[in-house]
Amino acid sequence: MEGIREGNQIRGKHFRFTVLTERLLRLEYSEKDCFVDGESQMVVNRSFPPAEFHWEEGKQGEGILRTKYLRLIYKGGAFSSENLRIFVSGDAGNTSALWHYGDKIESLKGTARTLDGINGALPLGEGIVSRQLFSVLDDSKSMLYHEDKFFVREDPEAIDLYFFAYGTDYKTALKDFFHLSGDVPLLPRYTLGNWWSRYFVYSEESYLELMDRFREENIPFQVAVIDMDWHITRVPEKYGTGWTGYSWNRELFPDPPRFLKALKDRGMECTLNVHPADGVRAFEDCYPAFAEFMGVNQKEEEPVLFDLLDEKFREGYFRFMHHPMEKDGVDFWWIDWQQGENSGMKGLDPLWMLNHYHYEDNKGENGEKRGLILSRYAGSGSHRYPIGFSGDTVISWESLDFQPYFTATASNIGYGWWSHDIGGHMWGVRDDSLFTRWVQLGVFSPIMRLHSTNNAFNGKEPWKYSRDAEAVSKNFLRLRKALVPYLYTMNYLAHVERRPLILPLYYEEKPWEGLYDYKNEYYFGTELLCAPITEKEDPVSGLGKVKAWLPEGRWVDFFTGEKLTGGRELELYRSLESIPVLAKEGTILPLDGREEGNAVDAPELMELHIFSGADGSFCLAEDEHEYADFQKEDWAFTGFSLRHTSRGGLVEEVLHISPVEGNENALPKERLFLLHLRGVSSLEGLSLTYGDTELPVEIGEYLEEEDALLLSLPAWDGKEGICLRYRYSQEKREEQELKLLENRIFKLLERAQISYDEKTRIYACLEDLGKKSRAEILGAVYSRCSSESLRGALVEALSASGV
């Protein structure tokens, strides 16, 4: 097979192979020899470091391309299963997979355009990682892009494939995909807090009254989402429906700039819902200027038809329809496109155009701000236009159960910033437990946006639910705001290190067959492992359950303080108050310590949750200006490290906080640290130095509910390093853990809807704690407990650290 090597390419008769990396090939075939070097919708960068490969002619004239990880054999002619195949090497270098052109790809899936009207699961598109050890992305039909315009390919029959042969090295596959398809942009910090959204006829007065009620209840919100009733919806019949609208309803919002400023004064940004499909009709405020600009007949009330392919319309679309409202205070747009995939240009999805042009326009005239939209997924490459709106889900346990998997799997195609209708959108029945579990999932999702449809009974205000549901949902919404320093660091890592916030289990642990079965378990950033509960509580035990895999190591439940030994499967049981969110021993988790208000800027008071028991580290990332493009000089980095040693019955741990590196203006002039020493109940020794100066430490209370001792550190200016050294008794710690176990079991029994005598018999088994083996105690508990769910919870508690 004759092929000419040019750099990283092999070109021959009607074909071109490009070796992007030793594991990533581009395969092109065009009878017209029309090969694409420019950008497409999916691909924006094919410039990779040089990769080592060999091209040779085989004994039967076939072309053979070899890298360290794969071997391609091509016999010439139009690609087919007979003439093109690739052998893929496993991680150990042995041939372990074979692909023929046209073979069905069984990847670990990617994501879908929308969850509109879905009750439960739906089929997902393909991703770039696979248990087959390879995957293929087809870029043949995507549009080409140049100088802000989209074009069809010269040869519409050309084949343009990307072959990913990364074995189980899923992280590298994802990083190279981002290199190829563009990095995930940085999000504004406020987006990582809470969003209030509801399809409901609000007025300026009623909306602000609600925001003030949230403030009185100490429920923080950072984003106000105004659904379609902000604009005129009741229009004369001759104009059609009222779904499309760009004129404020002055009966409801008489002074829009005043309303938007009032939201800003409350610490909230604002997005408006738009359905742009009907263009601009004669009743719109912007019609005269836009109609004159477009040259349509105003006397006949000729509409300005929606056509993003028309460059002039596109200019006016933003100039007359959006920019004036942005000047009044609208921050970004919720693009609610539901009119299909026909744009008038074959292969070009109008949703893609809307996402692209809206995102780019939202950056500002000089591209100085971070672009932002809320819109549906439009295919591979959509990660460049965050944030994703997953659509109008059905309110059901089935929908909730699908969402963790749906969110995590989207990372397999780089789509890391989904925003779901938390609590569900429509239909369904009221279920306070379902609402609460959905809020808990939302707090540990990329974006936390409560939403519901236009139904007077379907609101997501916490006080509309039972007392327990109200209390729990409020606490979780407050926690979401507290998580912003951690989430903003993950935002930085998603952009700079190409690591999405949410990752399935199989990214962090060497995959084995059963690992893929834990579909609803995922990593939430670098430090937390989440296993949300997506089923209703058992009526006897009052507990929800999730089956989870715990990777090797010792894990601590963020909410309960329970310690769990990894390397095994567990059934985890939790009351409505919490879900399993686990941190490994040694984890350092930074939280915003402010208890009131909507502000999410870099906090003066920071809580550090230090999970005792192992070495660990964390680097906090903060910036000053939130520039659109990453500028390292604008960022500040604070390093935290924990060193753990144990000797002679004493445990010693040393926490180091490094001097701030980078832009000191990204932090407050002084910062206070409130430490939660998780897994520590009392101290035998304590010392603190800032630089070379020894300072006092304020020892606070011990919080049994999270098994944490509180310490308050003096104000810190970031210029000197902090060294905190503390010691505790291993014997006392073991005694405390037994006490915590007894209390945990007592609460399980106290809650259970079983006879008092049965509770007493079960609790009597604990008299032998510390005397008999856990296996013997478990056997006794098992024989005395009639409830399967309660038995499971007791087994979890008693075997938490291994039997």
Residue ranges and their predicted role:
Residues Y359, S380-G388, F402-F406, A410-H420, ...:
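Catalytic core of carbohydrate-active enzymes
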Residues M1-M42, S47-P49, R499-Y507, E513-E521, ...:
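Extracellular/luminal recognition modules and glycoprotein regions
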Residues R16, L24, I64, R71, ...:
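Beta-sheet entry/capping signal
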Residues Q9, V19, K32-C34, A51-T191, ...:
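Catalytic and substrate-binding clefts that recognize carbohydrates or anionic sugar/phosphate headgroups
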